[in-house]
Swiss-Prot record:
Protein name: Sec-independent protein translocase protein TatA
Region Disordered, residue ranges: 47-69
Keyword Membrane on entry: yes
Upper classification of the organism: Bacteria, Pseudomonadati, Chlorobiota, Chlorobiia, Chlorobiales
Subcellular location: Cell inner membrane
Transmembrane parts of this sequence: 1-21
Gene Ontology biological process: protein transport by the Tat complex
Length: 69
């Protein structure tokens, strides 16, 4: 995961704990989880739209080449 080892992750967690305090960590984690969920949803929508447009493209090309013949 991004080239981070266990020690680096523990260090980052300790820094976050010091910056935000133990009371804010659940709220921070909840917000981060919601943000990641929203990002994945948007990513899936974009991927589906791209695949859909790629599937529609050959059909349009076949129709135009057939009419040119």
């Amino acid at each position: 995961m991004f080239g981070l080892g266990g020690q680096e992750l523990v260090l980052i967690l300790l820094i976050v704990l010091l910056l935000f305090g133990a009371q804010k960590l659940p709220e921070l984690a909840k917000g981060l989880g919601k943000g990641m969920k929203e990002f994945k949803r948007a990513q899936n929508e974009i991927e589906e739209e791209f695949n859909k447009s790629m599937d529609d493209n050959p059909k349009k090309e076949k129709a135009t080449t057939a009419s040119k013949s």
